[in-house]
Amino acid sequence: MSDYLVKALAYDGQVRAYAARTTDTVSEAQRRHQTWPTASAALGRAITAGVMMGAMLKGDDKLTIKIDGGGPIGTILVDSNAKGEVRGYVTNPHVHFDLNEHGKLDVAKAVGKNGMLTVVKDLGLRDFFTGQVPIISGELGEDFTYYFASSEQVPSSVGVGVLVNPDNTILAAGGFIIQLMPGTEEKTIEQIEQRLQTIPPVSKMVESGLTPEEILEELLGKGNVKVLETLPVSFVCRCSRERIADAIISLGPQEIQDIMEKEGYAEASCHFCNETYHFTKEELEQLKQLAEAKN
């Protein structure tokens, strides 16, 4: 099964729901950044939430999530858009702790609870929406739940999970977002709350082979879910050699000349995907000429 997400309605439109399988996407992030298990779980949870939140956007809109809880993992940064494309990184990928008292990876300890979760939506035409809430648990699912309630005034339940193999590879990853529309009946809310208390962790559901549609049925009941759209999900970075070259050109002829004399080459890495771009002295000379032409 490839990664994808579903958008759905349930209970005759009273509930909006999203569910995603992100195992391959989180695996690609782990491979690129060589994250250790606890860092993999933290980054994977953020990526999973990010791609589902991106699916709430339209057209070319995009969003950035910044999680900075003051923990040893540093900052988690995730970019996503309305097309199911997501990328992300963590400042300190080599963070791992013993399992917590529940036998799970200790994401809260890695993330920390002394900081903020920030969401910036780029809605085009210089129209930005910024929402920011304090991190309340560091487990991230609860933090995104709090974000929706506090910043967007939408009662929600967010579940995100990642299972990591002993060799650091990703066994399973996925998540869901359940949102109550205005006027949701009390009976509906009670039924959903009961199901949320009894279902297995979302990562376990993905591991057992459940599709995003089936995960929503577990959450909301069979026959209640009306799928509106399915969307492929993947790790996509928009960096390129051309963009890095443009950045070097923008330094100006003199600074490029200094690099050529001191280093003899230039190397730049993209934070989001860890791709490294190398420019030889000859290539720098060409970029210097382009910079001179611009001046």
Swiss-Prot record:
InterPro entries: Heat_shock_Hsp33 (IPR000397), Heat_shock_Hsp33_C (IPR016154), Heat_shock_Hsp33_N (IPR016153). Signal peptide: none annotated. One of its GO terms (molecular function) is unfolded protein binding. It is found in: Cytoplasm. The keyword Disulfide bond applies. Pfam families: HSP33. Gene3D superfamilies: Hsp33 domain, HSP33 redox switch-like. The keyword Metal-binding does not apply. NCBIfam families: PRK00114.1. Belongs to the HSP33 family. Redox regulated molecular chaperone. Protects both thermally unfolding and oxidatively damaged proteins from irreversible aggregation. Plays an important role in the bacterial defense system toward oxidative stress. This is 33 kDa chaperonin. It comes from Geobacillus sp. (strain WCH70). The lineage of its organism: Bacteria, Bacillati, Bacillota, Bacilli, Bacillales. The gene is hslO.
